[in-house]
């Protein structure tokens, strides 16, 4: 399947999202879980990706006491309020469960990076402000 290039500058603000890179050590070396998105998906259909997705309203509406303060601090983003930081962890756990049936403990997630989809033309007309987490 060929990916179509979006030729327009994207003016919408990026949506907060979370992605999990699941890693495990194996005798033959490091293994990484990638999933193939459904071809009809509106974002990167047919492409291999890490499990993840945008924050749902429920992620913010129901703050969880399961996210330790040390993990919120680990995001190292002074401008990020505690409720949104906790929601990012919850979204990472929820999306991993929804997309591949793996139930992660919040404490197993470690912040790795933050990527924001550019406004310039690219492979999608949607923008995301994604926090990447590693779980091993």
Stretches found by the model and what they are:
Residues 1-136:
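N-terminal leader/linker segments that precede catalytic domains of diphosphate-processing enzymes
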């Amino acid at each position: 399947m060929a990916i179509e290039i979006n030729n327009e500058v994207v003016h919408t603000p990026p949506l907060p999202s979370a992605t999990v890179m699941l890693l495990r050590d194996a005798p033959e070396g490091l293994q990484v879980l990638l999933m193939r998105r459904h071809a009809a998906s509106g974002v990167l259909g047919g492409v291999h990706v890490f499990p993840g997705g945008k924050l749902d309203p429920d992620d913010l509406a129901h703050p969880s006491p399961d996210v330790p303060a040390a993990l919120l601090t680990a995001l190292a983003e002074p401008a990020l309020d505690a409720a949104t930081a906790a929601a990012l962890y919850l979204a990472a756990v929820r999306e991993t469960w929804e997309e591949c049936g793996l139930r992660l403990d919040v404490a197993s997630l470690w912040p790795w990076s933050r990527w924001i989809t550019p406004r310039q033309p690219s492979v999608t007309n949607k923008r995301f402000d994604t926090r990447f987490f590693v779980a091993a």
